[in-house]
A protein has these predicted regions:
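FAD-binding core/adjacent interface of flavoenzyme oxidoreductases
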Residues: 2-3, 7, 73-143, 207
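Beta1-alpha1 glycine-rich phosphate/pyrophosphate-binding loop at the start
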Residues: 2-76, 155-181
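Conserved N-terminal Rossmann-fold NAD(P)-binding element of oxidoreductases
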Residues: 10-12, 108, 147-148
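Hydrophobic beta-strand scaffold positions of dinucleotide-using enzymes
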Residues: 35, 107, 203-205
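Short loop/edge segments at beta-strand edges and connector loops
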Residues: 79-82, 87, 173, 193-197
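FAD-site-proximal beta/loop scaffold in flavoenzymes
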Residues: 121-140, 199-249
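Rossmann-like NAD(P)H-binding beta-loop-alpha module
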Residues: 131-167
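Internal nucleotide-binding/catalytic subdomain
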Residues: 168, 180-217
Length: 249
């Protein structure tokens, strides 16, 4: 990477946060060109601690990564804006209600969103799902259902049990997805397991896997897309048609 040109860091994910921290600690390793981080908010939540936040073990500020402060420490500009797409042919990042941003080099760390599979609140983006849980009444007699019995769904529903010891909780799985030991654990926690696609009109939280951010063309026209809406990358985490202009996480 030469000193000339503009490097854009698209998204405030964990990888970009760690890179900023490294540049702040070792400024001699920071590239010499103009660098800007673009993210929809000035803070990011560390997702690994979210079940603990839901359970009441942590306060929200303990999970918050201050991206603006990291940028200041690393000598990087920060722009608070929502990324809506990417035009790799013209080397432009598309933003909501803002002019597009030109780049010479681009690094993507935009995260993922929950895969839609039913009516409910997706666990990702985290800000919306956490606001939903804050709005819920722990004494409500209507069961809250977590849809998806993978690792995330299990963590979330068990965290909810600690948060709400008396609230009726359900976990919806594909038939036969959970092994007997997990079934027993959920039974002991008084969490009802629902098989299949049983309809549910009450409040629900989607933990149904993740997919890419759902960008529309020209991204899909100029960049190869992998499954679940993710951008295809080479073994070096680069985008083959755009290398070396972009790297991707």
């Amino acid at each position: 990477m030469t000193a000339a040109g503009v490097l854009l860091l698209a998204g405030g994910g964990h990888s970009h946060a760690l890179v900023l921290k490294r540049w702040a600690m070792r400024p001699e390793q920071r590239p010499k060109q103009s660098i800007t981080l673009v993210n929809r908010s000035s803070t990011a939540l560390y997702s690994g601690m979210v079940p603990g936040l839901i359970a009441g073990l942590y306060q929200r500020d303990e999970l918050a990564i201050d991206l603006r402060q990291l940028c200041d420490q690393a000598g990087v500009a920060f722009m608070e804006a929502e990324i809506t797409g990417l035009n790799p042919q013209d080397k432009c990042l598309l933003l909501r209600n803002r002019p597009e941003l030109h780049f010479d080099w681009l690094s993507l760390d935009v995260g993922a969103v929950s895969r839609p599979s039913a009516t409910g609140i997706p666990i990702k983006p985290l800000e919306a799902s956490l606001a939903f849980l804050e709005s819920e009444d722990p004494s409500d007699s209507e069961p809250l259902r977590v849809i998806g019995a993978g690792a995330a769904g299990l963590e979330v529903v068990l965290a909810l049990r600690r948060r709400w010891p008396q609230r009726a909780l359900q976990l919806q799985q594909r038939s036969g997805q959970l092994d007997p030991a997990l079934q027993q654990l959920l039974q002991q926690a008084q969490i009802k397991v629902i098989d299949g696609d049983d309809s549910h009109s009450g409040p629900s939280l989607l933990c149904t896997g993740s997919q890419g951010p759902g960008w529309r063309p020209p991204v899909c026209r100029w960049i190869p897309m992998a499954g679940s809406g993710r951008i295809a990358a080479s073994r070096w985490r680069g985008i083959p048609p755009c290398s070396p202009a972009a790297t991707v996480r």
